[in-house]
Amino acid sequence: MSTFPTSTIVHPTVLLSVVDHYNRVAKDTNKRVVGALLGSNNKGVVDVSNCYGLPFEEDEANPNIWFLDHNFHENMFAMFKKINARENVVGWYSTGPKIRPADQDINELFRRYTPNPVMVIIDVAPKELGIPTKSYVTVEEINKDTSESTMRFQHIPSSIDAVEAEEICIEHLLRDVKDSSISSLTTQITDKKISLKHLLTNLQEMQHYLKLVCDGTLPPNHQIIGYIQDIINLSPNLNANEISKSFAVQNNDTMSVIYLSSMIRSIIALHNLIINKTANREAEKKADIINSTPPTTATSPSVADKGKEKEQNAFNGADKPSKQA
């Protein structure tokens, strides 16, 4: 029996395959595409290394009515198994972009092939920078009042990782897209901006949840409240003098590096300007010398030319004495 999934690792080839599947089947529509995920489960870490699309249809008016081709799935899995016997069905993917009512039934269908399938929602048209995958697993939840058990999706961490061969391929694909003029500092600032934006979104979600609990709209979940308390306890006290001093020192160091970089860039540009100016002056001097040289005139035949003419006449017999009659 496989270990219960705690996190997922999605490879870039899977993302490319899903985007290709979506562009071929459901581009410019409101439909989504569904497929199977292949990989391995290593102590709860699900490594998704391959995938393939499945014929899938669902009724737009009634999302609970859907169709998935089982025979196609089993035939495809048998062919993939011949290529790589280590890859097993670990779950399924959907282009979402959110959880839909039929997802619980589809997830139960994939339990035939793996005890704990993961559902990965892949956003094929992300509006924000970041990881375009969200992973979920189903957990059983018991209602304290009715003692009835229900299944619900629980979010688990998701990341993008690649092996060496995949990294080389991705670098070739992004070679014409990547702008080499972007400095590492700009990249770091962009990454920090994205991280802060995600942090703000998570804080707003926690605030909204706590407000609903205080208003009595939602029942308090002590596990979630405990997680929020741990996050608050781990947050630093920004009002402390040491942290303010550290921020000031870091900011001063960063500004010093930026200032020195600008100065070096200016000095190099000035040096190149001087070199170009010197080269232009040398070129102008050479042009003046060439223009001031008088043109050559026609001269009398040289001694060498006369010698050649004499040899030619001797060859023709012009210098031989004529015979007397």
Curated annotation (Swiss-Prot):
Gene3D superfamilies: Cytidine Deaminase, domain 2. Residues 285-325 are annotated as: Disordered. One of its GO terms (biological process) is proteasome-mediated ubiquitin-dependent protein catabolic process. Coiled coil: none annotated. GO terms for molecular function: metallopeptidase activity. The keyword Acetylation does not apply. GO terms for cellular component: proteasome complex; proteasome regulatory particle. CDD domains: MPN_RPN7_8. InterPro entries: EIF3F/CSN6-like_C, JAMM/MPN+_dom, MPN, MPN_RPN7_8. Transmembrane segments: none annotated. Residues 292-302 have a biased composition (Low complexity). Residues 8-142 form the MPN domain. Keywords: Proteasome. Acts as a regulatory subunit of the 26S proteasome which is involved in the ATP-dependent degradation of ubiquitinated proteins. Belongs to the peptidase M67A family. This is 26S proteasome non-ATPase regulatory subunit 7. It comes from Dictyostelium discoideum (Social amoeba).
